[in-house]
Amino acid sequence: SAADLEATLAAAAAARRPWARTAGGVGSFMVQVAKGMGAKVVVGIDVNAEKLARMRDFGADATINPREFAGKELKERFKAIAKEAGVSANTGWKIFECTGTKPGQETALSLLSFVGTLVVVGYGTDETSYMLSKLMAFDAEIIGTWGCTPDKYPAVLEMCLDGRIQLGPFVETRPMSQIQHVFEQAH
């Protein structure tokens, strides 16, 4: 629920926990939110080099392209990044899966470990297999969320106003005469 997400974000910020996330269209915003809330390390994961560069531009400490590092290699790269940053690679990570794709979900699930939290943000229709007893063994949790509640809007607005979240690079102004074309492009 949104309340669970808010609790997770608050706990992560308070503990300055590291964050991992698999990207998508929301990726650069999630990186900014994580950094804005004080995450010690943010790792962005995406198959698109432009999105990875954008995440680095907006605060990701490291990025991983699953096309370059697949399966166990990706996990090893993730561990190396954590070691370089001086944080545990398998304890307490907050993972945000934003793509909604089966590969993104599988990557996120593969990184979930001890006292970690996976927050599913991206919507997808593919089924994914996961051994639920791992949640018990890892004392981990998986949360699904659609967004935050209106009472959190002031905090988000504050991060936008003080520059922790940059909106300008994501906004494009077009004349009203193009509204039909823009709508068609967006849908």
Task: List where the protein language model places each region.
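Short, well-ordered coil/turn residues at beta-beta hairpins
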Residues: 66, 96-98
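Hydrophobic Val/Ile/Leu positions in short beta-strands of Rossmann-like dinucleotide-binding domains
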Residues: 19-21, 97, 120
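Short loop/turn segments at beta->alpha junctions
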Residues: 70, 100, 175-178
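Glycine-rich phosphate-binding loop and adjacent beta-alpha segment
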Residues: 38-39, 56, 61, 99-164
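Short amphipathic alpha-helix with an adjacent loop that forms part of the alpha/beta core around
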Residues: 70-90
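Short SAM/SAH-binding signature in class I
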Residues: 91-96, 116
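C-terminal hydrophobic helical "lid"/dimerization subdomain
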Residues: 83, 106-107, 150-187
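Mid-domain Rossmann-like dinucleotide-binding core that forms the NAD(H)/NADP(H) cofactor-binding site
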Residues: 1-69
